[in-house]
Amino acid sequence: MQRNAVILAAGKGTRMKSNKYKVLHKVAGKSMVEHVLTNVKNAGVNQIVTIVGHGAEDVKETLGNQSLYSYQEEQLGTAHAVKMANEHLKEVEGTTLVVCGDTPLITAHTLQKLIEHHESTHAQATVLSATAQIPFGYGRIVRDEQRRLQRIVEEKDASEAQKALTEISSGIFAFDNRVLFSKLEEVKNDNAQGEYYLPDVISLILAENGVAEVYHTDDFNEIMGVNDRVMLSNAEKALQQRINIEHMRNGVTIIDPTTTFIGPDVKIGMDTIIEPGVRINGETVIGEEAVIGQYSEINNSHIGSQVDIKQSVINDSIVGDKTKVGPFAQLRPGSNLGSDVKVGNFVEVKKADLKDGAKVSHLSYIGDAEIGERTNIGCGSITVNYDGVNKFKTVVGKDAFIGCNTNLVAPVTVGDGVLIAAGSTITDNVPNESLALARARQITKEGYLKK
């Protein structure tokens, strides 16, 4: 059966008090609408239409070709928003899911269960509900004496008795697609807000003795909407807790989950230890038995097994097995460290390959370079890669020893087994098994200060 989805992402989000479009605010490193779209796709939906309004181009840039788009010029209510998808879905068969773009905690599992319940009961509409301790602001689920859905009433239209109900509508629905777009034509705006409410489609279905169902989730957090910065913070905490718990149950030790921030797409191997204050984002993959030291930050990188990282920043890089990084090192984009490499304190690496066993232990900059196996780069050594206009490459062979405070002025190639004397500035290529010394001769004038 064809499964479609409409993501509602056209609201202004004025309570966020931000120049940024509401659904583009991030939770756990990804925009809210990206979370929603990912989980909708993972629930088995074939075609997605996102309703955009304010900030439409920014949303399109974020989601790209993962979705079709319809534009809602005026925000006249949720039914009006869904109606904008007419151009893509009106003649389509199957089930259509309607999800708010500001519900980043909804899971693919719950959406899938909602769809399955809807289809198995042959319902024309199904609403996802939850029980709220404080239901203020949510539409209430009103049931009859047989516990069947009677209607959904919005907060501002509810009686005092209805406001006392604690089962609330999530704003997430599954519909028979043809029924949905047929009934949208009949929805009126005769309510306190003067808006076209999507839940009124359910009232229209029930008025004709159609089948409307409720699927209840036990996790209220899943349907949490985000309307201001306080709610954004609450969503961040809830999602981060969920992510951390999942990693811990998969065999990862997280010393202090309350100060550890891990993105939703991160993968971490068993017996890895994450110390307090760590941030791991993007599509980072970490192997087994690694130690990620406190206050480290890793973004979109591949970290091997048994790696030890201490208080360092790693971006868009690869770190091989048994390699040590830090403390206070930085791997900038394009860094590729092999196995058993050492990048020590206050070392910066950028767009460089360090082969297996290479060591850069202290206070060095290695940029646009290739460093061979087992080569040692002495303290304070620099690859001089930039002439003010262009970047040039430095190549150092295997088993070389680069003395302290050496400048390698690119483009330059240093061969295998070379020894560079400390304090040298190397501007010419050095052949294999050579000694290179490039510094001024020391002059000592004894007794000079006594004159």
Swiss-Prot record:
> Region labeled Pyrophosphorylase — which residues?
1-229
Question: What are the catalytic residues?
Answer: H362
> What's an example GO cellular component term for this entry?
cytoplasm
* Pathway annotation from the record: Nucleotide-sugar biosynthesis; UDP-N-acetyl-alpha-D-glucosamine biosynthesis; N-acetyl-alpha-D-glucosamine 1-phosphate from alpha-D-glucosamine 6-phosphate (route II): step 2/2; Nucleotide-sugar biosynthesis; UDP-N-acetyl-alpha-D-glucosamine biosynthesis; UDP-N-acetyl-alpha-D-glucosamine from N-acetyl-alpha-D-glucosamine 1-phosphate: step 1/1; Bacterial outer membrane biogenesis; LPS lipid A biosynthesis
Q: Which residues bind UDP-N-acetyl-alpha-D-glucosamine?
A: 8-11, 22, 72, 77-78, 139, 154, 227, 332, 350, 365, 376
User: What detail does the entry give on cofactor binding?
Assistant: Binds 1 Mg(2+) ion per subunit.
Chain sites annotated for binding Mg(2+):
D102, N227
Report the cofactors: Mg(2+)
**Database matches in PROSITE patterns:** HEXAPEP_TRANSFERASES
Can you cite a GO biological process for this protein?
UDP-N-acetylglucosamine biosynthetic process
Keyword Cell membrane applies: no
What Pfam family is a match for this entry? NTP_transferase
Residue ranges of the region described as N-acetyltransferase: 251-451
Q: Which of UniProt's keywords are assigned here? A: Acyltransferase, Cell shape, Cell wall biogenesis/degradation, Cytoplasm, Magnesium, Metal-binding, Multifunctional enzyme, Nucleotidyltransferase, Peptidoglycan synthesis, Repeat, Transferase
Q: Which domain of life is it from?
A: Bacteria
Positions with a binding annotation for acetyl-CoA: N385, Y386, A422, R439
| Residue segments, region Linker | 230-250
Q: Which reaction does it catalyse?
A: alpha-D-glucosamine 1-phosphate + acetyl-CoA = N-acetyl-alpha-D-glucosamine 1-phosphate + CoA + H(+); N-acetyl-alpha-D-glucosamine 1-phosphate + UTP + H(+) = UDP-N-acetyl-alpha-D-glucosamine + diphosphate
Q: Which cellular compartments is it found in? A: Cytoplasm
Please provide, alphabetically and separated by semicolons, the GO molecular function terms listed in this UniProt record: glucosamine-1-phosphate N-acetyltransferase activity; magnesium ion binding; UDP-N-acetylglucosamine diphosphorylase activity
EC no. given is 2.7.7.23, 2.3.1.157
Similarity comment: In the N-terminal section; belongs to the N-acetylglucosamine-1-phosphate uridyltransferase family.
Quaternary structure note? Homotrimer.
Its annotated function is as follows: Catalyzes the last two sequential reactions in the de novo biosynthetic pathway for UDP-N-acetylglucosamine (UDP-GlcNAc). The C-terminal domain catalyzes the transfer of acetyl group from acetyl coenzyme A to glucosamine-1-phosphate (GlcN-1-P) to produce N-acetylglucosamine-1-phosphate (GlcNAc-1-P), which is converted into UDP-GlcNAc by the transfer of uridine 5-monophosphate (from uridine 5-triphosphate), a reaction catalyzed by the N-terminal domain.
Protein name as catalogued? Bifunctional protein GlmU
Organism field: Staphylococcus haemolyticus (strain JCSC1435)
